[in-house]
Amino acid sequence: MFDEQGSPRMYANILLSTDGSDVAKKGVKHGIALAKALNAKVTVITVTEPLEIDYGGGHAGGWVPSKEEIDRFDAAHKESASKVLDEVRAMVEQIGISAELLHVPNAYPAAAIIETAKSKGCDLIVMASHGRRGLKKLLLGSQTSQVLADGSVPVLVVC
């Protein structure tokens, strides 16, 4: 991407990831402000993980959910993701930019973030240092670590 003078822009297409946690909201706010300052395109992603099924590890036990349980699980995740994205929608409208808002269901967050950045042509990922699973501020979250290790796009980590 190039600016009005024909000079290349460093970041023109930014992917923001959020799980709705307080630290993720902070990351989204930083990403939105950066996108506004750079006049960059914004895509926001929230990912909900698949239902874990216990096949019993080769033993007689295990648990396989019914269709109704799967439907309830999917509906709850869809509702949760909708709330997260509604909050982000309000943030981007308040600052005066537009954003594409995506929910990726039944996926693993790091893989979905990396794939979305690639498929959308993003040149920067902004994400929190840790999300809901973060135990301590001193530790980098597992999803963030995986995006840093496996991704090919620069990552801005907000703590």
Residue ranges and their predicted role:
Residues 1-5, 115-159:
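Gly/Ser-rich helix-loop-strand patches that form or flank binding pockets
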Residues 64-83:
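A short acidic, glycine-rich active-site loop
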